């Protein structure tokens, strides 16, 4: 397994691999890997000749008073996960390598970035789109894999790749959950035991909405009320948003259908957690 920190070395390596006719599968992450990341890596291993993992906590997607400084990091552990999953190259650039002092460019994907997380984290998806574009230019992947837990991020990246003709196949992978239903997230490490117990209300609300939809309920108002009632039973939880949207456009809807995204974000103490489901899709 090759570990590369410099942009020039990574680009030179990628060009050489392309000249050899090798396909590159890419999994961009901020590190502190868990089983959700591992599932992306295993799929990437199956789909590409060369598997590249990036570990980079991207400062420009964090807002003021967010958790950039305390975001969990464990390079040694991450390298162990990477080796176990058959990664060929780990790209570990520094912030100054990615964003030198003269850096000025930003990528913005307008409409799909505005609702949901975009409404409460202004500028976040500009930071995501910018770093992903730069990573694509450096790694030169044929395929890139992302988890569906960050559903809006996936939608932003799909739109960006299509609009800019970036030529990368984007694969969205199912949410991976703990045995008790909590969606895996690097930020789960922040949760104290009582907070983690309260956070299970997110997956309970998703299960309740899916069951009601399967039983014939189509009213978004009724489904929203049901989910909010479940979340509100937990005093430690504060809803940021709880919404039903078209899965492709993220536009609001009034009647649920098979292409309806149910997405929610909840603050648990100082930790922000997100979860989602598409109602017409069988859960993994």
UniProtKB/Swiss-Prot annotation:
Subcellular localization, as worded in the UniProt entry: Cytoplasm
UniProt entry tagged with the keyword Cytoplasm: yes
The protein's name in its UniProt record: Pantothenate synthetase
Family statement: Belongs to the pantothenate synthetase family.
Catalytic activity, EC: 6.3.2.1
Pathway noted in the entry: Cofactor biosynthesis; (R)-pantothenate biosynthesis; (R)-pantothenate from (R)-pantoate and beta-alanine: step 1/1
Disulphide bonds in the chain: none
Subunit comment: Homodimer.
Coiled-coil features, chain-numbered ranges: none
């Amino acid at each position: 397994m090759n570990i590369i920190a410099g942009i020039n070395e990574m680009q030179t390596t990628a060009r050489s691999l392309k000249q050899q006719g090798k396909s590159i599968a890419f999994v961009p992450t901020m590190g502190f890997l868990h089983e959700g990341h591992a599932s992306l890596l295993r799929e990437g291993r199956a789909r590409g000749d060369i598997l590249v993992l990036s570990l980079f906590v991207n400062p420009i997607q964090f807002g003021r008073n967010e958790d950039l400084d305390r975001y969990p990091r464990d390079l040694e552990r991450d390298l162990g996960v990477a080796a176990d999953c058959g990664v060929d190259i780990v790209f570990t650039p520094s912030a100054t390598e990615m964003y030198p002092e003269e850096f000025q460019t930003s990528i913005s994907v307008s409409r799909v970035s505005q609702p949901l997380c975009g409404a409460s984290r202004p500028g976040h998806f500009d930071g995501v789109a910018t770093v992903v574009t730069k990573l694509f230019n450096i790694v030169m992947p044929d395929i890139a894999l992302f988890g569906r837990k960050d559903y809006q991020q996936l939608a932003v990246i799909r739109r960006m790749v299509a609009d800019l003709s970036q030529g990368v196949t984007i694969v969205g992978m199912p949410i991976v959950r703990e045995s008790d239903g909590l969606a895996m997230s690097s930020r789960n490490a922040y949760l104290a035991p009582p907070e983690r117990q309260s956070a299970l209300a997110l997956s309970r609300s998703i299960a309740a909405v899916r069951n009601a939809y399967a039983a014939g309920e189509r009213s978004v108002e009724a489904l929203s009320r049901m989910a909010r009632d479940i979340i509100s039973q937990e005093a430690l939880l504060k809803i940021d948003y709880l919404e039903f949207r078209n899965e492709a456009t993220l536009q609001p809807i009034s009647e649920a259908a098979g292409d309806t995204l149910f997405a929610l974000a909840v603050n648990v103490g100082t930790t922000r957690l997100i979860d989602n489901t598409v109602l017409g899709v069988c859960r993994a």
